[in-house]
């Protein structure tokens, strides 16, 4: 999948317009205004969607998320048919990416998701049209999110909430905080530890990362689940 724009035209690929996303969001929010049920938009990808949600949240209660891929990359990163960047929703323009980051910073967007969709290499080493969509994202989610803290675009507290307490509230699970009575699921992070994404160092069985060879800052050092340490770097 690729954004319907200049890059798709240059590569001779059929793109997906932002209107495909906008129409669904506007339709669902119109229904939500009448039905009054719980509603979550899993992954936004366009500036126009952020604008719509900002206006609708003044009168309607719902939540929304964004993929870390769409916060960190844009359609130009696809370059010459990089199939590891064939994602759903597609990467859009740099202007869209900046609007998504601002939407997160302003509290319009509630959660950041990994959009973890591992695929074996054979399914990605095909033509762009034939390749499967998706990227392995769990192991790079935190570090890519912290990029926006390190460059000053999003407060650390906002990033932490978007990765922990906000998803827990949406799913109504007893997690995401260190308050008394909550499940002791947490991690210890070195905010400044530098590392480089290398396929051979990823724990995931599938290595289809969207950010191979990218230099990142911030790393999980320990992970605890229900108080038990399950991972240590």
Question: Which residues does each PLM region occupy?
Answer:
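Short capping/connector residues at structural and topological boundaries
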Residues: 18, 76, 83, 90-92, ...
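Residue-level signal for inorganic ion chemistry
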Residues: 39, 65, 115, 145, ...
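C-terminal cap of metal-dependent C-N hydrolases
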Residues: 127-130, 183-233
């Amino acid at each position: 999948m690729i954004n319907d724009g200049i890059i798709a035209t240059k590569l001779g690929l059929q793109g997906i317009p932002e209107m495909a996303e906008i129409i669904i969001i506007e339709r669902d929010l119109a229904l939500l205004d009448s039905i009054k049920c719980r509603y979550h938009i899993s992954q936004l990808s366009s500036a126009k969607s952020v604008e719509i949600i900002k206006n609708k949240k003044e009168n309607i209660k719902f939540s929304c998320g964004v993929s870390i891929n769409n916060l960190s990359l844009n359609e130009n990163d696809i370059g010459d048919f990089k199939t590891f960047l064939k994602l759903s929703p597609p990467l859009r323009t740099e202007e869209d990416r900046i609007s998504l980051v601002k939407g997160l910073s302003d509290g319009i967007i509630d959660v950041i998701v990994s959009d973890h969709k591992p695929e074996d290499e054979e399914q990605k080493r095909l033509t762009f049209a034939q390749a499967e969509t998706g990227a392995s994202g769990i192991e790079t989610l935190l570090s890519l999110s912290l990029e926006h803290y390190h460059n000053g675009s999003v407060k650390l507290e906002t990033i932490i909430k978007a990765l922990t307490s906000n998803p827990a509230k949406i799913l109504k699970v007893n997690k995401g905080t260190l308050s008394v009575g909550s499940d002791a699921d947490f991690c210890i992070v070195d905010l400044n530890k530098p590392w480089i994404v290398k396929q051979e160092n990823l724990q995931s069985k599938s290595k289809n990362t969207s950010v191979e060879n990218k230099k990142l800052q911030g790393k999980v050092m320990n992970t605890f689940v229900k108080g038990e340490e399950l991972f240590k770097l």
